[in-house]
Amino acid sequence: MFAIETREVPTQTVLTEQRVVFAHELQAFIDDAMGRLLATADSLGGVTGPAFFIYHDEITDENSGPMEICLPIDPARAEETDAPTRVEAGHREAYTRIPKRLVEYPQILAAYQAVEGWIAENDTEMIDSPREVYFADFMAAGPDELVCDIAFPILPVEAV
């Protein structure tokens, strides 16, 4: 059901906001943080790539975990803000593209499991936390429109 592909992701400077949340708190955190981050990015010339959300641990209704929202900006402008920024190192990713209707918990878990399975079957390793990469206008998209990549940073297959 899920087609898995790989890609190279360049090094990016990102605005970032992190919080430890439960699954039922995710949407409120995303809405609040994205408002702040987008306003800051606009003051720095705008975003330079898709927003991505990094899940540094499993987040469920019973277990909280750290979640990070990242918004790429022009690295030359990063010093102009007091908002937290960092450099996200370039890497290779295995990913699958999903429609808006699957970007809900627990439905989204099947996409994560598909990418994890591909990683195991292809003898590579995850080297950083999984992420959701939002490349389309989520609010304007219909339920069957592709809006998000479920992505895992991996070692290049030949490096394993």
Role assignments for model-derived ranges:
Residues 1-160:
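A solvent-exposed interaction/effector surface
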